[in-house]
Amino acid sequence: MTIAATEALTRCIEHREIFHDEMLHLMRLLMRGELSPQIASALLMGLRVKKETVGEITAAAQVMREFATPVVTPNPQDLLDMCGTGGDGSHTFNISTTAMFVAAAAGVPIAKHGNRSASSSSGSADVLEALGANLQLTPEEVAECVAATGIGFMFAPAHHGAMKNVAAVRKELGVRTIFNILGPLTNPAGAANQLMGVFHPDLVGIQVRVLERLGSRHVLVVHGKDGMDEASLGAATMVGELKDGVVREYEIHPEDYGLSMMSNRGIKVSNREESRALVIEALDNVDGVARDIVALNAGLAIYAGNKADSIPEALALAFETISNGSARAKLEEFCAYTRKFQK
């Protein structure tokens, strides 16, 4: 065991924060596979039991970004990511993935970071493939997609190869660790703007402050009070916002924007084909909960992407983009463009 690991474990046992430089060092050891499985497991569980701090998560995210395979674009400060933690257990269709087509059609350049299903019925990569997208793209091809269509999708395993060094430990543990909240913090394109859904209310304030330290521009971190890692129509939504260097926390309610409170029962799915059907239904402007929850989340994305000065203005733009067909057209454009790169 390294001296740094011994000190870190002692700090976890005593519920004290691991110093920033120590956390950087330990994460580099983890990402290089230089800690034994026993020490890696002890460290991950120690952090979880102690509860990871903003400083520790920030350091861990910085190291994951160091090890990531980047996507280079001319203006990362304009890009928006829409990547949630997942793990909310709601089994709803892919709301944020659908909303990205609406936001992109409204002029927000999207660099979405996503993966296959871990705990849900359909991950973002799963449903995009069901919709006809090719996700086996090089970083250069992703950047070309962003330039040509306004959307790039970065399949997480292709950009975070070092994660293979902790995969066995995570699988053996079988419980959430710090890595479950690092994914949305490690966008390979360096997107400065973000709409992030989180599975636990405590993460709203934590993640927005981590992104503040990481230098983000405009961020909304959301948690539906019915447990969703999205803005919800079934309950109020907690929001942590970073804008102009200032963090605010507040709640939004569907009724504030003229939306009806609706149950999420009608948007639960059990596989990617059911999710695909609801994506199409929402983008085809079929009246109902699928369309409205997509519009709500797309509105927040448009606001976070700085294409509207307020949430009400952004929500109106989201509904307009759905109703005039441009969001559905954006889906078709993106999928067709990615297929150009099929080997």
UniProtKB/Swiss-Prot annotation:
One Pfam family named in its UniProt record: Glycos_transf_3
GO biological process: L-tryptophan biosynthetic process
EC code(s) of this entry: 2.4.2.18
Entry binding sites for Mg(2+) 1: 96, 230
Cofactor notes: Binds 2 magnesium ions per monomer.
Residues that coordinate or bind Mg(2+) 2: 229-230
Catalytic activity: N-(5-phospho-beta-D-ribosyl)anthranilate + diphosphate = 5-phospho-alpha-D-ribose 1-diphosphate + anthranilate
Thylakoid in keyword set: no
Residues reported to bind 5-phospho-alpha-D-ribose 1-diphosphate: 84, 87-88, 92, 94-97, 112-120, 124
InterPro entries associated with the record: Anthranilate_Pribosyl_Tfrase, Glycosyl_Trfase_fam3, Glycosyl_Trfase_fam3_N_dom, Glycosyl_Trfase_fam3_N_dom_sf, Nuc_phospho_transferase
Coiled coil residues, start to end: none
Cofactor(s) recorded in Swiss-Prot or TrEMBL: Mg(2+)
Role noted for this protein: Catalyzes the transfer of the phosphoribosyl group of 5-phosphorylribose-1-pyrophosphate (PRPP) to anthranilate to yield N-(5'-phosphoribosyl)-anthranilate (PRA).
HAMAP family: TrpD (MF_00211)
Record protein name field: Anthranilate phosphoribosyltransferase
